[in-house]
Amino acid sequence: MKTTFLDFEQPIAELEAKIEELRFVQDDSAVDISEEIERLSKKSQQLTKDLYANLTPWQVSQIARHPQRPYTLDYVAELFTDFHELHGDRAFADDLSIVGGLARFGGHPCMVIGHQKGRDTKERAARNFGMPRPEGYRKAERLMRLAEKFGLPIFTFVDTPGAYPGIGAEERGQSEAIGRNLYVMAELKTPIITTVIGEGGSGGALAIAVADTVMMLQFSTYSVISPEGCASILWKSAAKAPEAAEALGLTAHRLKALGLIDKIINEPLGGAHRDPKGMAALLRRALADSLRQFQGMSIDALRERRFERLMAYGKFKETTPGA
């Protein structure tokens, strides 16, 4: 598949186009231009390194939304075996924006749950662009309860702009479904490992992200609102999204510094979409390390650790009026 370049990557795109042109010429010519191709390839690689070493939060947001970025089912295919998808919330419908099911990780049974976007227009519409409705969160809760019953560790993958704000979703109890998931996950008697693989949009992300450890891919984001939404509220213009992204502190490095996540998983040069298999290998190692950390831990110790982790979020200072 031909790589789609973002606006700020145009210098790289131009170099890559030149390299492709030279390769095409070399195939139909007796002239050896391999040295020139190699020189330009090295230049492109260095340019990518320099560009990605100085990304703004807004540029990171764009990478997190890249249309070729691996989604949950892509990682399921690479990291897990014997995946058997489970459907429906047993109350209303099957929401395709949340996928989940039984699988094996490293030969051990587990439960996998994650947001799922689509690749083409038809699939994007079917999966509601990765924005779950209440039935999606209730399906996730059902699978979590099932995992708890059989003592299976839970892996969740976050990639959503946010919970769907439609009238029907609100009528069916969107806020209740999200709130219940937060409550349930805080008390589950089994390990929960969460990875933000793309967008981590507000409560829609948090509803499957109350975990024993939360990791983020290097160029993923996690925030209470999208930069465009924040800009529209504070500046009355979505054009202020770059400033909003800076103010939100939505990058992995910022959140790690604040203690809101536990680990950052580095991505291949140019982002996960440039080397999905390489990204999967890095993620596999991180998931295995996290799971190993909780194996052998008693249920009481696991839940106590999770509770302490949740209570450590945020800081406040008490002051006396007039002091």
Curated annotation (Swiss-Prot):
GO biological process, any: malonyl-CoA biosynthetic process
Domain of life: Bacteria
Location(s), subcellular: Cytoplasm
Keyword Lyase in record: no
Metabolic or biological pathway: Lipid metabolism; malonyl-CoA biosynthesis; malonyl-CoA from acetyl-CoA: step 1/1
Gene Ontology CC annotations of this record: acetyl-CoA carboxylase complex
A Pfam family it matches: ACCA
Gene Ontology molecular function: acetyl-CoA carboxylase activity; ATP binding; carboxyl- or carbamoyltransferase activity
Top-level EC class as recorded in UniProt: transferase
Major subcellular location class: cytoplasm
Catalytic activity: N(6)-carboxybiotinyl-L-lysyl-[protein] + acetyl-CoA = N(6)-biotinyl-L-lysyl-[protein] + malonyl-CoA
Segments forming domain CoA carboxyltransferase C-terminal: 39-293
Listed PROSITE patterns: COA_CT_CTER
Documented EC number(s): 2.1.3.15
Keyword vocabulary terms for this entry: ATP-binding, Cytoplasm, Fatty acid biosynthesis, Fatty acid metabolism, Lipid biosynthesis, Lipid metabolism, Nucleotide-binding, Transferase
InterPro entries: Acetyl_CoA_COase_a_su (IPR001095), ClpP/crotonase-like_dom_sf (IPR029045), COA_CT_C (IPR011763)
Family affiliation: Belongs to the AccA family.
Functional summary from the UniProt entry: Component of the acetyl coenzyme A carboxylase (ACC) complex. First, biotin carboxylase catalyzes the carboxylation of biotin on its carrier protein (BCCP) and then the CO(2) group is transferred by the carboxyltransferase to acetyl-CoA to form malonyl-CoA.
Alphabetized PANTHER family for the sequence: ACETYL-COENZYME A CARBOXYLASE CARBOXYL TRANSFERASE SUBUNIT ALPHA, ACETYL-COENZYME A CARBOXYLASE CARBOXYL TRANSFERASE SUBUNIT ALPHA, CHLOROPLASTIC
Record's subunit section: Acetyl-CoA carboxylase is a heterohexamer composed of biotin carboxyl carrier protein (AccB), biotin carboxylase (AccC) and two subunits each of ACCase subunit alpha (AccA) and ACCase subunit beta (AccD).
Protein name: Acetyl-coenzyme A carboxylase carboxyl transferase subunit alpha
Species whose genome carries this gene: Burkholderia multivorans (strain ATCC 17616 / 249)
